[in-house]
């Protein structure tokens, strides 16, 4: 039988057929030789309506407050001196120093971002020489603090300033470490200005509570669901994407004669059948607190649950009344725990989940013991598939990513396993920058069509081609001579992430496992789009809020204690060492630790964020 409930209708078949199958089947065996990059053209900028940009920025200023270019402390003299030297490099070669964590933004085996083909083209097109500075791998946080503490900083620093600088971005501006950009955007960043004209709500993410625009953001964007044509940078919408979620063995489903589970009852019945009919040792298996894993299970109960060591962003959600709530104290959390306790008690959930790591979970999957788990796509499934077939060419292994669990079929969850469109990191212009114009023009180039294609796709004719209006990889990427995975081969041509709009379609295509058979590629795409387009329709977690210095100390002290307690009690409730009859007492204890004050602080931060949008 064929399993039902497989959602593979993300978009018209044109999107899959033209782009994926076209690349898989008919990529050129001899890619076109890379032509000399065109000289930097101003057409993207001049095509914009200058008056509308001016009106937009004026309206933003009225909304966010007066521009703070003469902030208190050392920033006054620093910003002023910088502003007067914005054109100092006009008469000679233009050079910009750029600090960025290579390990988290490249993905290629290079010593400098400047070695990437996209950046070679950017330097040629813009006429700007970029001197990259990279912290040692794994030491970005420490070296960020050291660089910022010094008197001389690079012109551009790409990092999460709002959360990593004491006091946030406003404090960094007041201290003269970075400059506010609102007075420069119209002239020096017309591409980004135009993008925010089209998507004004996103401006709040890079605007401080005091009204300062403090950097060029890294955001996820996507061609509209169902679109028959790929969309350029200005038409793509901000997008809450996810490349992680629930996976189930469809070959096992066929063996037990059942469809892909949708509701909690469906999941229970399927896992029970896996155990009783197939003798699976671990019908469901996952790593404790695996990033976003719990939301795929908890969302149907109306709660957002904490993961990743109970960081401040997780566990909190925004309800239908636009109020902040904490999932682990809601009634739905009790239902979530009861469901997992039921699976645990009946041997349907691996009883060792508290101590499992990703390697041990994969080992059990490879042995055929697991029917459902949490996976990252597509590298996770692709690697598993290749390892299984290597040992057993006749293995029927087939798995697909599925929707979050729901209470009732046909209903839509409020919370989803998705990342917010804004990643939290920005390219900020530092107070040491002597040529603001050049630094901003460099970053703004990535917000125009030409620069954005380079950063996302690489070199046209070499790493990608346009086929029926869709970018698709050439054979140099898909079937490269070195035998590398497409994502690895592509890493030399594009920047993995950074202060520009990232194209979800590129991320989707680059993550496709082309070693799979044609039908399995179809499943691969279906899984990714189930998670990103179905699960990620809404992001109702906390946006890019910031806490005041006066709030941070009180909040951290209380929430750290709460996080530890919630984690301990969650494990006890799931394993049954603590009866769920004591759930109300547990909630009272959480509030006695200062939960209400934490909620009040987060609500005030959300209110300030919302005020930026209005």
Show the residue positions of the predicted features.
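Conserved small-residue motifs centered on glycine
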Residues: 450-571, 577
């Amino acid at each position: 039988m064929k399993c039902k409930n497989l959602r593979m209708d993300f978009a018209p078949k044109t999107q899959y057929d033209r782009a994926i199958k076209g690349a898989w089947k008919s990529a050129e065996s001899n890619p076109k030789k890379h032509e000399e990059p065109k000289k930097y053209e101003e057409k993207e900028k001049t095509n914009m309506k200058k008056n509308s940009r001016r009106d937009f920025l004026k309206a933003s200023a009225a909304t966010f407050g007066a521009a703070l270019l003469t902030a208190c402390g050392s920033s006054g003299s620093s910003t002023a001196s910088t502003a007067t030297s914005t054109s100092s490099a006009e008469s000679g070669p233009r050079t910009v120093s750029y600090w960025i964590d290579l390990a988290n933004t490249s993905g290629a085996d290079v010593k400098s971002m400047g070695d990437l083909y996209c950046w070679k083209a950017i330097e040629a097109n813009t006429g700007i020489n970029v001197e990259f500075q990279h912290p040692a791998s794994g030491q970005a946080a420490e070296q960020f603090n050291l660089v910022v503490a010094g008197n001389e900083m690079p012109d551009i620093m790409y990092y999460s300033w709002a959360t990593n600088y004491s006091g946030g971005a406003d404090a960094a501006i007041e201290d003269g470490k970075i400059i506010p950009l609102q007075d420069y955007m119209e002239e020096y960043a017309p591409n980004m200005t135009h993008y925010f004209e089209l998507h004004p709500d996103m401006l709040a993410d890079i605007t401080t509570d005091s009204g300062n625009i403090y950097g060029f953001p890294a955001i996820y964007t996507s061609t509209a669901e169902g679109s028959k044509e790929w969309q350029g940078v200005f038409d793509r919408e901000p997008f809450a994407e996810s490349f992680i979620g629930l996976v189930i063995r469809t070959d096992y489903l066929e063996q037990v004669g059942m469809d892909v589970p949708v509701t909690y009852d469906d999941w229970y019945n399927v896992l029970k059948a896996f155990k009783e009919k197939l003798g699976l040792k671990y019908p469901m298996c996952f790593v404790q607190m695996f990033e976003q894993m719990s939301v795929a299970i908890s969302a149907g109960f109306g709660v957002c649950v904490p993961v990743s060591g109970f960081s401040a962003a997780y566990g909190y959600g925004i309800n239908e009344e636009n109020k902040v709530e904490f999932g682990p104290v809601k009634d739905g959390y009790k239902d979530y725990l009861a469901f997992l306790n039921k699976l645990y008690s009946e041997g349907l959930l691996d009883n060792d989940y508290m101590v499992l790591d990703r390697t041990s979970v994969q080992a059990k999957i490879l042995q055929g013991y697991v029917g459902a788990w949490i996976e990252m796509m597509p590298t996770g499934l692709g690697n598993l598939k290749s390892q299984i077939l290597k040992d057993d060419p006749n293995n029927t292994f087939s798995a697909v990513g599925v929707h979050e669990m729901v209470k009732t079929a046909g209903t839509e969850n409020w919370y989803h396993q998705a990342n917010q469109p804004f990643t939290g990191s920005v390219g900020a212009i530092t107070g040491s920058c002597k040529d603001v114009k050049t630094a901003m023009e460099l970053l703004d180039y990535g917000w125009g069509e030409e620069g954005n294609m380079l950063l996302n796709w690489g070199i046209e004719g070499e790493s990608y081609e346009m086929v029926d209006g869709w970018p698709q990889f050439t054979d140099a990427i898909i079937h490269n001579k070195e035998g590398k995975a497409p994502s690895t081969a592509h890493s030399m041509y594009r920047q993995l992430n950074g202060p520009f709009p990232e194209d979800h379609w590129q991320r989707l295509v680059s993550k496709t496992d082309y070693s799979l058979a044609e039908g399995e590629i179809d499943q691969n795409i279906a899984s990714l789009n189930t998670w990103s387009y179905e699960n990620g329709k809404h992001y109702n977690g906390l946006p890019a809020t910031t806490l005041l210095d006066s709030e941070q100390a009180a909040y951290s002290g209380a929430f750290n204690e709460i996080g530890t307690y919630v984690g301990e009690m969650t494990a006890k409730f799931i394993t049954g060492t603590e009866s769920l009859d004591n759930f109300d007492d547990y909630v009272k204890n959480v509030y006695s630790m200062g939960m209400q004050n934490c909620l009040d602080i987060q609500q005030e931060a959300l209110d300030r964020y919302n005020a930026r949008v209005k």
